[in-house]
Amino acid sequence: MKRMIALDGAQGEGGGQILRSALSLSMITGQPFTITSIRAGRAKPGLLRQHLTAVKAATEICGATVEGAELGSQRLLFRPGTVRGGDYRFAIGSAGSCTLVLQTVLPALWFADGPSRVEVSGGTDNPSAPPADFIRRVLEPLLAKIGIHQQTTLLRHGFYPAGGGVVATEVSPVASFNTLQLGERGNIVQMRGEVLLAGVPRHVAEREIATLAGSFSLHEQNIHNLPRDQGPGNTVSLEVESENITERFFVVGEKRVSAEVVAAQLVKEVKRYLASTAAVGEYLADQLVLPMALAGAGEFTVAHPSCHLLTNIAVVERFLPVRFSLIETDGVTRVSIE
């Protein structure tokens, strides 16, 4: 019997990332775990619908035995079974992030006995989670370089706080892993601004695009009007295509916050990314830790190692026989496997 791994959910940033990473790694390695103080660092600690959906999805995909899988629970015991490929559908029942549920179960399906399709309904444009377009346009091309083949499709938008969106991913088992090297992003090739609107006046998008264009030379400026019943909602994105990587940054509009202020938040984030030579932004760095660890080698550079990133690395090192190295030089941190 494999040893039980004990995790403290209050570790590091004290959010849901510890639980999501632990579920992924437990399914992959077969190691059971217990976690206490789940989301202790959040205003509403314990399992919310999004986290409970991730637990139930993991349980179904590998036939796990679970204790503590209920709303508000701050303790969970998870004993994984065998990961099975197949066609899965999960509903969050709120505007909780579809992509974070997918992030939990897809790594296990890289090791399944056949191809899979996972469909999740809930929130797609959530201020605290990467949107589907980020997964599709930024993360998945990098996963393909590592040898991981999955394809995400946004079937319907669901803005926070209403939800109602649907995201699906098709994934194949990994034949072999390759090493990812992302030391520098290289010169910028082009930048693209995009605004999504649902049940929001078009002039909001025009003002947001104008704010972006006032700070950056945009190769493309796109405004997409979605059906009113998918809103109300508004998301502003800016994609930075460089020689070695494409990064994408986003901000979700809020009620009683002007279009100019919303877009200015995005401008600030992109300028911070461009101020260094680092290849990877803060959100993407979080996503690369697990696939890189599974490959057993690789590196990337990031300007600002987040608490999320450090917490994720700590959890990965509990389950896998790898050690990460973080070396800071001239404001850029090189993250690699020793």
From Swiss-Prot:
Spell out the molecular function terms from Gene Ontology. ATP binding; RNA-3'-phosphate cyclase activity
What SUPFAM superfamilies does this protein's entry cite?
A: EPT/RTPC-like (SSF55205), RNA 3'-terminal phosphate cyclase, RPTC, insert domain (SSF52913)
Phenotype for H308 to A/G: Loss of RNA cyclase activity and RtcA adenylation
Q: Which domain of life is it from?
A: Bacteria
**Binding site residues for ATP:** Q103, P130, Y283, D286, Q287, H308
Effect of loss of the gene: Disruption of the rtcA gene does not affect growth.
What main location does UniProt list? cytoplasm
Keywords in UniProt for this one?
ATP-binding, Cytoplasm, Ligase, Nucleotide-binding
GO CC terms: cytoplasm
Q: Please report a single Pfam family linked to this protein.
A: RTC_insert
Keyword check for ATP-binding = yes
Asked if Cell inner membrane is a keyword of the record, the answer is no
Q: What does this protein do?
A: Catalyzes the conversion of 3'-phosphate to a 2',3'-cyclic phosphodiester at the end of RNA. The mechanism of action of the enzyme occurs in 3 steps: (A) adenylation of the enzyme by ATP; (B) transfer of adenylate to an RNA-N3'P to produce RNA-N3'PP5'A; (C) and attack of the adjacent 2'-hydroxyl on the 3'-phosphorus in the diester linkage to produce the cyclic end product. Likely functions in some aspects of cellular RNA processing.
Q: Which HAMAP family match?
A: RTC (MF_00200)
Q: Which family does it belong to?
A: Belongs to the RNA 3'-terminal cyclase family. Type 1 subfamily.
The name this protein carries in UniProt is RNA 3'-terminal phosphate cyclase
Q: What organism is the protein native to?
A: Escherichia coli (strain K12)
